[in-house]
Amino acid sequence: MLEVKDLHSFYGAAHVLHGASLQVAPGEVVALLGRNGMGKTTLIRSIMGLTPPTVKQGDVIWKGETITRMKPHDIANKKIAIVPQGRRLFSSLTVTEHLTMFKSARATEGWTIDRIFSTFTRLGERRHHRGNQLSGGERGMLAVARALMQDPELILMDEPSEGLAPVMVQHLEGVIAELGRTGLGILLVEQNLYSALAVSSRVYIMETGKVVHSATSEELAKDEGAVQRWLGVHG
């Protein structure tokens, strides 16, 4: 289980996280919602040990071990993977070469390239295409697939559906839901309320650097008006 306890993170002198706390259990898909600038990406980066920001108070605990302030490489070796914003790819490498590069040296089973291509059928069709030949949706799928090749037990996804066409969003939602059923824990940063409710079992809502509400997706689905007010969504 991932436990984040009272985390305070800073960008220089700017206090960005103000005591954020949450949990992700094995096989649980947890959505982290909030408007831009509320600290969602900062929280993801703090969990993964990426700098900036700088964590000055609080703890990140993974499977009973405190990993706060560990180096990102050491955290990745704990079988935690990240799908960051930006979807940066190597323009000269093919889809297959990207996956081979990210294959975990520790893994003896789990995610293979064949399994990736059966899960992400579009990537299979484009396996020989280079990074600069992929659409935005295909790049997003490849970013998720690369993380899976590390054979993680927990994956942190920072707005993986951003900029995707509706058909690609629907496909990604199906993949995320299926991953949760395999026992993979997922912390999913989202701004799309409906995507979050479609795949998650629990939702945390962030505002000004802290978690201000937590509920099951079923509970929030019954109180959509309240969620829209919290997120500043109208209409």
Question: Predicted segments — roles?
Answer:
Residues 1-235:
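Glycine-rich phosphate-binding loops of nucleotide-dependent enzymes
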